[in-house]
Amino acid sequence: MQKEIRRDDIIGSRRFSNYFWAVFLCSGGISFLLAGISSYFKINFLPFANPKELAFIPQGLVMSFYGTLSIALAIYILGTLFWDIGSGYNEYNKVENLVKIVRKGFPGKNREILLTYPLTNIRAIGIKISEGLNPKRSIYLCLKDERQIPLTPVQQPNSISNLEEEAAELAKFLDLKLENL
């Protein structure tokens, strides 16, 4: 029975890089906001600097703006970490003849995203590799109606050999051809 069902877990937003950026933006944002407030009230709120000597307009105002923006972005990233946005699984079920793609979204009516496709509607497994400044290496589910559904999570790009091996295993499991997109 286990040879008829394959399940690949997907790590969502709970990656080290997101924790790093949340802490970095939060600490930097608080520091900038306190520096801006210190320059306005002429009271030093930072133990490691003396921002009360800064002119509030324009330096203190700009630092307050950047601090507020940074804290807002950190709160957004912490929200994605808390709700584990993007996590889920891909299930390939030969018994039910279905492919299920499940992901967590933001709270609301679409909190859980469920995509279900019959195996008969799947044309191939596709690999898309684009190099450059922002390289992307992904595996896609190619449907007969020409849609391409991404299967790989957002992360640092895998090596090309690992990506090809993973795609070949999946294509072999589903008895589908492998395409280069």
From Swiss-Prot:
Gene Ontology CC: chloroplast thylakoid membrane; photosystem I
GO biological process, one term: photosynthesis
Sorted UniProt keywords: Chloroplast, Membrane, Photosynthesis, Plastid, Thylakoid, Transmembrane, Transmembrane helix
Positions of transmembrane segments: 19-41, 61-83
InterPro entries given in the database record: PSI_Ycf4_assembly
Zinc as UniProt keyword: no
UniProt subcellular location: Plastid, Chloroplast thylakoid membrane
Annotated signal peptide: none
Major localization listed first in the record, in broad terms: plastid
Top-level taxon in the UniProt lineage: Eukaryota
Lipid bilayer topology: Multi-pass membrane protein
Protein family (similarity comment): Belongs to the Ycf4 family.
Protein function: Seems to be required for the assembly of the photosystem I complex.
NCBIfam families in the record: PRK02542.1
Record-given protein name: Photosystem I assembly protein Ycf4
